[in-house]
């Protein structure tokens, strides 16, 4: 875990939500350029792709009353965020762009897909950079402990 503690962590990338939108390739490249580690969020699309987005819907960042789980990764890629040229990347695209240049902390939003853990394991087992997964869902964290102990994992806590 030392790789994750050596530098500040850019939560959802390094962004201002004006010119650079959170959880986009632009925000992650900005974090890398400024020597930050990256925290990002993953949800599943209709076609079972792991896409990088914090919310379960598009209301806040695209002003659309649509659910992520109801759209394919291509449909999501075609939606521009906050009047910029940025769209919702897949986790594969982010891993390719980051390419081990900085540590990644992946928050799993497990509420929208029952097999998100399996899909993330498939994707992450071939990634060579420093990476860990985390979740508020203890069952998700237990799943990684039992089924993918080679991936670092952690539980996120909150006030009751």
List the predicted regions and their residue ranges.
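Phosphate-group recognition and catalysis centered on beta-loop-alpha active-site segments
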Residues: 1-160
């Amino acid at each position: 875990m030392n790789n994750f503690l050596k530098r500040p962590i850019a939560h959802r990338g390094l962004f201002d939500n004006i010119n650079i939108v959170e959880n986009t390739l632009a925000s992650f490249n900005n974090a890398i350029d400024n020597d930050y580690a990256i925290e990002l969020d993953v949800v599943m699309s209709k076609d079972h792709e792991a896409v990088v987005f914090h919310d379960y819907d598009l209301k806040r960042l695209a002003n659309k009353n649509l659910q992520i789980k109801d759209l394919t990764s291509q449909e999501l890629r075609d939606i521009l965020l906050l009047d910029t040229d940025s769209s919702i990347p897949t986790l594969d695209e982010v891993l390719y762009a980051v390419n081990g240049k900085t540590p990644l902390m992946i928050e799993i939003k497990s509420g929208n897909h029952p097999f998100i853990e399996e899909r993330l394991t498939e994707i992450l087992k071939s990634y060579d950079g420093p990476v860990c997964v985390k979740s508020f869902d203890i069952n998700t964290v237990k799943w990684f402990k039992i089924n993918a102990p080679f991936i670092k994992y952690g539980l996120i806590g909150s006030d009751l």
